[in-house]
Design a protein with these regions (language model features):
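Conserved acyl-donor/pantetheine-binding loop and adjacent beta-alpha core of acyl/acetyltransferases
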Residues: 57, 63-89
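Conserved acetyl-CoA-binding loop-helix of GNAT-fold acetyltransferases
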Residues: 98-113, 136-137
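A short beta-loop-alpha structural element at the N-terminal edge
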Residues: 3-19
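Conserved GNAT acetyl-CoA-binding A-motif
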Residues: 113-126
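C-terminal "cap" of GNAT-fold acetyltransferases
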Residues: 82-85, 125-130, 136-138, 144-156
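Active-site rim helix/loop that mediates acceptor-substrate recognition in acyltransferases
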Residues: 30-59
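Helix-loop element at the rim of GNAT/NAT acetyltransferase active sites that forms part
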Residues: 19-35
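A short, internal acetyl-CoA/4′-phosphopantetheine-binding micro-motif in the GNAT/acyltransferase core
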Residues: 87-98, 125
Length: 156
């Protein structure tokens, strides 16, 4: 197995990030008859102020990514806190999950957000999802719960 390299993402990575959204929401998508394409607002029109992505590669191939984006209150993400707090998404392809790549991505993205001057990051996670302990271990704290979905926030 080769070493994982984390690099800055750009517009050329958007098809990969878009494909990762199916994995991010796939663990509960079975409850729906069709895949909810409204989640694509997490990557559509990439390059706006406040967009930042990191891509994890292994042997030159992308295996995961983490990114954050600001959302307006009129079109919030699932983990929306306020218009000044970017919402984070972290996804590792299934074949590489459980190997610490997600933790590396979260740590690196927290550093990126702090360097960019943001006071916090938020994230949405389903209660009981494997990422919940990882996020709490990185200092994310619950700010809201709706049904089985948690909104977590990490001050930077």
């Amino acid at each position: 197995m080769t070493d994982v390299v984390i690099r800055r993402g750009d517009k050329l990575d958007m098809p990969f990030l878009r494909s990762l959204l199916a994995f991010a929401y796939g663990w509960h998508v079975a409850a729906f008859d069709t895949f909810d394409t409204s989640i694509y607002h997490y990557v559509d029109t990439w390059g706006r102020d406040g967009d930042s992505a990191l891509v994890a590669t292994e042997g030159g191939h992308p295996v995961g990514a983490a990114w954050f984006r600001l959302f307006p209150a009129t079109r919030p993400g699932f983990g929306f806190v306020d218009e000044e707090t970017p919402e984070m998404t972290v996804v590792v392809i299934p074949a590489r999950q459980g190997q610490g790549i997600g933790q590396q991505l979260v740590s690196a993205l927290l550093e990126r957000a702090k360097a960019d001057g943001y006071p916090a990051l938020s994230v949405s996670v389903q209660r009981g999802h494997a990422d919940e302990p990882l996020l709490r271990g990185q200092g994310f704290e619950q700010v809201r719960e709706e049904r089985d979905t948690l909104t977590l926030r990490r001050a930077l």
